[in-house]
Amino acid sequence: MPIRHLPNRHMYSASSQSTGEFAHPSADSTPTGRPTAYPVDVVVSLRREGTARLLRTLRSHQVLPALLHPWGSGAAYRSLLREPDSLSLLDVPEGAVTDDLAQRVHVLSALSSVVVLTPGHIDSVDLLRAGAANVLPRDMPPPELAGRLTAERRWLGTSTPSRDRRVRALPQQVLRPRQLSQGILLDVLLSSARPWCCHDLCLLLGTARAPMSRRALQARMLRLGERLTPYGLSVTSTVQWGRTTYTGISG
């Protein structure tokens, strides 16, 4: 499957580190709060040091948001789920673990459209088949990369119907979990248009180096179920051939 060739255009800005690399957001924003200067809503990194260097390289262009997030960041997933047609950038620097890269693209594409930045030695075909909107080389000249990301946002906005991934509202009396990890798990289940296999959820909620263990996922699901039970709600799931599939929240 060929990679689309998109026109060049300029724009961006960055600087320090906590959950990521800071940039200077635009004063203008959409009704949902996304800065209009940034084509990309969230940057997710499989190796933070390499992505931080990329942000500094792109300092003079307005294409990336304020923070760099490591894989598994609840804050990143929450931001993506708040936007009806979000765009994430999955950066794969040299030295990142790439054995399960296609599967990572697959699970992240359930939350947003995904553009992947890769080193030259990674084949793009499997990533496109896994659901990537586009795959771009990391060594592309900064002005060209900025233009491609800007054009990607424009192309997604005009070529396909909006895929609404926003979180469905809970009944008013239900108190949301205070823990970010529990809240994100709840939001993923509430926003999903398809069932989630336990292996996919473990990968989504793990780190860049390793998925979450199935035992840890089961414990988290149990705690979430206990919070929902007083409101007459439950996590629905099926088990077949040793694999648990979570189908959402019911009640």
Which residue stretches match the model-derived regions?
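Short amphipathic alpha-helical recognition elements used for nucleic-acid or partner binding
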Residues: L175-A208, L224
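Alpha4 helix (beta4-alpha4-beta5 surface) of REC/receiver domains from two-component response regulators
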Residues: G120-N134
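Conserved phosphotransfer microenvironments
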Residues: T51-A52, G72-S112, V116-S124
